Amino acid sequence: MAHKKAGGSTRNGRDSESKRLGVKRFGGESVLAGSIIVRQRGTKFHAGNNVGCGRDHTLFALADGKVKFEVKGPKNRKFISIEAE
């Protein structure tokens, strides 16, 4: 009699969808107001001049201009600002 033994089960085979986080506009790039600059979890980057912070910590431009990355303060925090053109 032809028999096939039953296959075993597995506990793998799933993964979460990627969230597409990261820097979307780099230093020196021109942006329009409302443009997303960084998508992040927590505040890896902080909002500087003319930059807003969304409730998921997304940083976005509040004015047209050029993106500027800078490190400030005693804790060497990374700030992102928009310099008006």
Swiss-Prot record:
It comes from the Bacteria. Residues 1-21 are annotated as: Disordered. Keywords: Ribonucleoprotein, Ribosomal protein. InterPro entries: Ribosomal_bL27, Ribosomal_bL27_CS. GO terms for cellular component: cytosolic large ribosomal subunit. GO terms for biological process: translation. GO terms for molecular function: structural constituent of ribosome. Gene3D superfamilies: 2.40.50.100. Pfam families: Ribosomal_L27 (PF01016). Belongs to the bacterial ribosomal protein bL27 family. NCBIfam families: L27. This is Large ribosomal subunit protein bL27. It comes from Photorhabdus laumondii subsp. laumondii (strain DSM 15139 / CIP 105565 / TT01).
